[in-house]
Curated annotation (Swiss-Prot):
CDD domains: bS6. InterPro entries: Ribosomal_bS6, Ribosomal_bS6_sf, Ribosomal_S6_plastid/chlpt, Transl_elong_EF1B/ribsomal_bS6. HAMAP family: Ribosomal_bS6. Coiled coil: none annotated. Belongs to the bacterial ribosomal protein bS6 family. It comes from Streptococcus pyogenes serotype M1. The keyword Ribosomal protein applies. Keywords: Ribonucleoprotein, Ribosomal protein, RNA-binding, rRNA-binding. GO terms for biological process: translation. This is Small ribosomal subunit protein bS6. PANTHER family: MITOCHONDRIAL 28S RIBOSOMAL PROTEIN S6, SMALL RIBOSOMAL SUBUNIT PROTEIN BS6M. GO terms for molecular function: small ribosomal subunit rRNA binding; structural constituent of ribosome. It comes from the Bacteria.
Amino acid sequence: MAKYEILYIIRPNIEEEAKNALVARFDSILTDNGATVVESKDWEKRRLAYEINDFREGLYHIVNLEATDAAALNEFDRLSKINGDILRHMIVKLDA
């Protein structure tokens, strides 16, 4: 299984319950498509290097996972581009 790390930035003005629901939804998208979520944690609220969608700060969230194929990653990528609460995301394959 290949190891991946996903970092995504959530808009800062989201309510806590909505943020928790968003994180749970995207974690379940990964697990429903065959990936194993090793760790999913909030990093911190950070100032952005440049303004994104009129926001100067964002809530960073990190997910470490293992996947045998790219189906889960492709679905995460597709849905995170559509979702307005996620400002940016990045998927990185870690060296084993």
